[in-house]
Regions:
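Active-site microenvironment for binding and transforming phosphate-containing groups
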Residues: 1-288
């Protein structure tokens, strides 16, 4: 796999692709944001479908234990990503996503949650930490990953934002938790809106469109296109960009994806493109 295999929405190099070679000889392609590497003490990635050992509709790097895949295969997939991130399974801390705006601070005692150990929490769509070595993990198949790096206070955050999280301003909630827990200044945070469904692929009903029109009053023309018959095209990328800028993220500190999961169903899992027959992609973020 190389970068040219993807269908990009434009030619900007917002995301790059690297090939990690595991100790067992397996190759693992991972997407990453160069902007977040401006702070050299951070590793970030977003997985593709390739480089794992799952089969069938889960081919091949599925990261979901709850959709019917072989648990041993899923665990091995996690191990490969952890290795690429310079860690082990016991370094990963997973969210428990239920489309909330709940954000939890995690520490070394949380290592392995969601992979090698049961999580003692539920309904957590965002994670933050200031502990080096922990690998934050959230999961996707069209929803929006949000990455946060505070290079001044050496803290990171990773959040899942579907349409409910976006209209609930999940990005703002994550920044507020980082401000409270680590004294982060939004003007110093580097942020990224990760691969997810684009506006051309994301048709929503009138009730969802109305919720966005109310929350993003004044920005309706930027995020919604009326298609008729009570249907609209919704731009989650622009919506999250607005949320993050409203929360104080500077334009030069923000990267917004140009890669759609639904446009690339052979390389990325997409719930909409597969009609629900799919695995999960993962966003990962680590302080070194």
């Amino acid at each position: 796999m190389d970068r040219e295999d993807f269908q990009w929405k434009n030619k900007e190099h917002i995301l790059e692709l690297e090939q990690f070679q595991g100790k067992k000889g397996q190759g693992l392609p991972l997407l990453y944001f160069p902007l977040l590497l401006a702070h050299t003490g951070v590793k970030n990635c977003f997985t593709t479908r390739e480089g794992g050992c799952s089969t069938g509709m889960f081919r091949s790097l599925n990261l979901s234990f709850t959709r019917g895949d072989n648990p041993q295969a899923v665990t091995e997939n996690y191990r490969r990503v952890a290795e690429a991130m310079g860690g082990t399974l016991s370094d990963i801390v997973c969210s428990d996503q239920t489309h909330t705006t709940n954000v939890r601070r995690v520490d070394r005692s949380c290592g392995g949650y969601g992979v090698t150990k049961e999580r003692p929490y539920t309904d957590v769509d965002g994670l933050v930490t200031d502990e080096p070595g922990l690998i934050l993990a959230t999961f996707y198949a069209d929803c929006v990953p949000l990455y946060f790096v505070d290079p001044i206070h050496h803290a990171i955050g990773l959040s899942h934002s579907g349409w409910r999280g976006t209209v609930g301003r999940m990005g703002q909630h994550t920044i507020e938790v980082m401000r409270r827990e680590f004294h982060s200044d939004p003007g110093e945070i580097l942020a990224a809106v990760g691969p997810s469904i684009c506006k051309d692929c994301y048709e929503v009903s009138e009730d969802v469109a109305s919720a966005f029109a109310k929350e993003f009053s004044g920005h309706e023309c930027e995020i919604l296109i009326e298609k008729g018959g009570g249907k609209y095209q919704l731009d989650l990328w622009k919506s999250n960009e607005i949320v993050l800028k409203d929360a104080g993220i500077l334009p030069e500190h923000l990267a917004v994806t140009n890669l759609c999961t639904c446009c690339n169903p052979n390389l990325l899992f997409s719930h909409r493109a597969s009609h629900g027959k799919r695995g999960n992609l993962g966003a990962f973020l680590k302080l070194v």
